[in-house]
């Protein structure tokens, strides 16, 4: 027994020793793994540090320093003057400019003290691009003691070097702003004395105003060089509240043109060259003088638009001055003419002190007067002249074109007849043949506007009307005040068929044509999908509040809004009286002009019982908080309190 016990004892001792060895090996392996992990982390940190060091390091390429968001501020902090170029790698002008810029860098490097020349890839250094308002490539700026000076000269070595050397002088200071600053103390004096001046009413906190500011100043500099100069001015509307109220300033920035103190709306662009071109055009006379009878005859024979002529004694005639003032109000939409010629007055069968409005020969007809006359005196109101011109600006049946659509054919209902419209010599007779058929109907419906339109110019509209495959040479449609469209059934066109069509519309017997995607088979999601055919049944449902988003599939802002909009719909899912909906406005008609879509996304709240007065979501962030607040402010059917929501 003793040997057996001894054997067992030895066996147990061996197992204990084996376990001890295994236990000793385990910790060594774990320790090794931990050490490896620590080493990997240290290597990653070193790599990150290397990348940060790479970003902070100012590299040089052919004498030009390379700056970015990370190293810019450190580099320029102690520099008096730095030349900067903001470029894009794909920009052709930047590539052409690169060799010249490298020469400039080498020249300025030799200056005592040397002036650093740097470039910034604005497509990757987005912070700097935004900070320095970079909107085009290449953009050149000179940094003087940390303040950016716009370079507006040519991209030549000589001119850039000269400007940099000028700015680098110790006594150089930026030139004062050319834009005049107006207050209630000097406003009337400055504005009343100017033949023409542009005034911006702004708010210091307004983002759009800040964006406009550099362009406005550049335009002011450019226009100050003209002879005579055209001044630009600005008014802080938050400080000068009386001036803002006096000129009905309700948003920022508001721009107005003043001519000897008389205000006119500014409807031009908001960037340097657009402002300059617009103001140069506006500074010219609103009416051009007609010197010869031949000019009038050419207007009548070859003209393509309404002819407006004022006949006066001379430039000192008070009636002429009043006519000029009225012309300024409409100069963007119509061409005004005047004459002091008695020969022309006799030809037009008018007297001095009269305004005549007439159509070129191709738009005249036996159903309407050849011309319309109005007496103009020094006391005649601008509005009276304006109303007269607008009343007779269109012929009984005019030519609707893409170029005049927005200015001439906005009145509804509009009856449009589509065919191959061509007033050139070879095709004029055919064009007038079909137009004469339209005239026979138009004379009996003075409350409607009639026009002919070339079917190719309006191919998209014809297709939306379902008429592109009609098989007929002539088609017709009616566009009404609410945005609805009505197509005439394809059949051989003549005056009788058009008359029947217009009469049926007048009696409300026509069904509108609505461009629409197919009605969704499954529309049970939190966000209801609206198409053209279901707009009335969903959005215009008088028993429900509806929040409707009009979107475009390609719109980036719409894509960003989608998850927020889905969350909003889920939040209010239990509200049976509220519908959260969306509609692809590029693939569906919006059959109501109350819901105007001028950009994407556009959001309206259509309250129950008042669908003709939807509320547009404007001004706030398109996030869950603001959209929820918008709903709760206008909802009529919420079953819970705001606190519960």
UniProtKB/Swiss-Prot annotation:
Subcellular location: Endoplasmic reticulum lumen; Melanosome
Principal place of residence: endoplasmic reticulum
All residue ranges annotated as the Thioredoxin domain in the record: 21-169, 158-301, 505-636
InterPro entries: PDI_thioredoxin-like_dom, PDIA4_PDI_b, Prot_disulphide_isomerase, Protein_diS-isomerase_A4, Thioredoxin-like_sf, Thioredoxin_CS, Thioredoxin_domain
Keywords associated with the record: Acetylation, Disulfide bond, Endoplasmic reticulum, Host-virus interaction, Isomerase, Redox-active center, Repeat, Signal
PROSITE patterns registered for this protein in UniProt: ER_TARGET, THIOREDOXIN_1, THIOREDOXIN_2
CC annotations in GO: cell surface; endoplasmic reticulum; endoplasmic reticulum lumen; extracellular space; melanosome
Disulfide bonding pattern of the chain: 91-94, 206-209, 555-558
Reactions performed catalytically: Catalyzes the rearrangement of -S-S- bonds in proteins
Modified residues (N6-acetyllysine): 366
Motif Prevents secretion from ER: where in chain: 642-645
Biased composition (Acidic residues): 38-58
EC number, as in UniProt: 5.3.4.1
Sequence motif: CXXC, positions: 91-94, 555-558
GO BP terms, alphabetized: chaperone-mediated protein folding; protein folding; protein secretion; response to endoplasmic reticulum stress
MF (Gene Ontology): protein disulfide isomerase activity; protein-disulfide reductase activity; RNA binding
Gene3D superfamilies for the chain: Glutaredoxin
Disordered: region residues: 24-58
Signal sequence extent: 1-20
NCBIfam families from the UniProt entry: ER_PDI_fam, pdi_dom
Family classification: Belongs to the protein disulfide isomerase family.
Subunit structure: Part of a large chaperone multiprotein complex comprising DNAJB11, HSP90B1, HSPA5, HYOU, PDIA2, PDIA4, PDIA6, PPIB, SDF2L1, UGGT1 and very small amounts of ERP29, but not, or at very low levels, CALR nor CANX. Component of a complex containing at least CRELD2, MANF, MATN3 and PDIA4.
Record protein name field: Protein disulfide-isomerase A4
Source species taxonomy: Eukaryota, Metazoa, Chordata, Craniata, Vertebrata
């Amino acid at each position: 027994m003793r040997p057996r016990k001894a054997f067992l004892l030895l066996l147990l001792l061996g197992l204990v020793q084996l376990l001890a060895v295994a236990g000793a090996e385990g910790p060594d392996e774990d320790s090794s793994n931990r050490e490896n992990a620590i080493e990997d982390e240290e290597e990653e940190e070193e790599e990150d540090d290397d990348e940060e060091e790479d970003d902070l390091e100012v590299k040089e390429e052919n004498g030009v320093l390379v700056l970015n968001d990370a190293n810019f501020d450190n580099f320029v902090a102690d520099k008096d003057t730095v030349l900067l170029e903001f470029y894009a790698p794909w920009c052709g002008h930047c590539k052409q400019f690169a060799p010249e810029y490298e020469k400039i860098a080498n020249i300025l490097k030799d200056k005592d003290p040397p002036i650093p020349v740097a470039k910034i890839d604005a497509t990757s250094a987005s912070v700097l691009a935004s900070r320095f308002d970079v909107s085009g490539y290449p953009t050149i700026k000179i940094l003087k003691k940390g303040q950016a000076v716009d370079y507006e000269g040519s991209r030549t070595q000589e001119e850039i070097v000269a400007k940099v050397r000028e700015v680098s002088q110790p006594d150089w200071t930026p030139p004062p702003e050319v834009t005049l600053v107006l207050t209630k103390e000097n406003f009337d004096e400055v504005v009343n004395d100017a033949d023409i001046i542009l005034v911006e009413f702004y708010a210091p906190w307004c983002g759009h105003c800040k964006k406009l500011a550099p362009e406005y100043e550049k335009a002011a500099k450019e226009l100050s060089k003209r002879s005579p100069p055209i001044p630009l001015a600005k008014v802080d509307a938050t400080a000068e509240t009386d001036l803002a109220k006096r000129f009905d300033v309700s948003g920022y920035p508001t721009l107005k043109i003043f001519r000897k103190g008389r205000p006119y709306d500014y409807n031009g662009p908001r960037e340097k060259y657009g402002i300059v071109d617009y103001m140069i055009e506006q500074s010219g006379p609103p009416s051009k003088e007609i010197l010869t009878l031949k000019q009038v005859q050419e207007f009548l024979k070859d003209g393509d638009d309404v002819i407006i002529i004022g006949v006066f004694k001379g430039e000192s005639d008070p009636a002429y001055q009043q006519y000029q003032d009225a012309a300024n109000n409409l100069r963007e939409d119509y061409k005004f003419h005047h004459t002091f010629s008695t020969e022309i007055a006799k030809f037009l069968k008018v007297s001095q002190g009269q305004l005549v409005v007439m159509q070129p020969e191709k738009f005249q007809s036996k159903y309407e007067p050849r011309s319309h006359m109005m007496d103009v005196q020094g006391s005649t109101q601008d509005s009276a002249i304006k109303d007269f011109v607008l009343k007779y600006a269109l012929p009984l049946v005019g030519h609707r074109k893409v170029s005049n659509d927005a200015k001439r054919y906005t009145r509804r209902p509009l009856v449009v007849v589509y065919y191959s419209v061509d007033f050139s010599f070879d095709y004029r007779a055919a064009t007038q043949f079909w137009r004469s058929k339209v005239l026979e109907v138009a004379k009996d419906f003075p409350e409607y506007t009639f026009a002919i339109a070339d079917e190719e110019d309006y191919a998209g509209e014809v297709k939306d009307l379902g008429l592109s495959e009609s098989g007929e040479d002539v088609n017709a449609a009616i566009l009404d005040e609410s945005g609805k469209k009505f197509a005439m059934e394809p059949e051989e066109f003549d005056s009788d068929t058009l008359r029947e069509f217009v009469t049926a519309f007048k009696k409300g017997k026509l069904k509108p044509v609505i461009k629409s995607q197919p009605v969704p088979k499954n529309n049970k999601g939190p966000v209801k999908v609206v198409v053209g055919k279901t707009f009335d049944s969903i959005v215009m449902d008088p028993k429900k509040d509806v929040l409707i988003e009009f979107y475009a599939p390609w719109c980036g802002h719409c894509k960003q809004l989608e998850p927020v909009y889905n969350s909003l719909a889920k939040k209010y899912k239990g509200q049976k009286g509220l519908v959260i909906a969306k509609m692809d406005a590029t693939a569906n008609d919006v059959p109501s002009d109350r819901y105007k879509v001028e950009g994407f996304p556009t959001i309206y709240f259509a309250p129950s019982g008042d669908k003709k007065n939807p509320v547009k979501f404007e001004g706030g962030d398109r996030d869950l908080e603001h959209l929820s607040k918008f709903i709760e402010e206008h909802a009529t059917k919420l079953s819970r309190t705001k606190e519960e929501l």
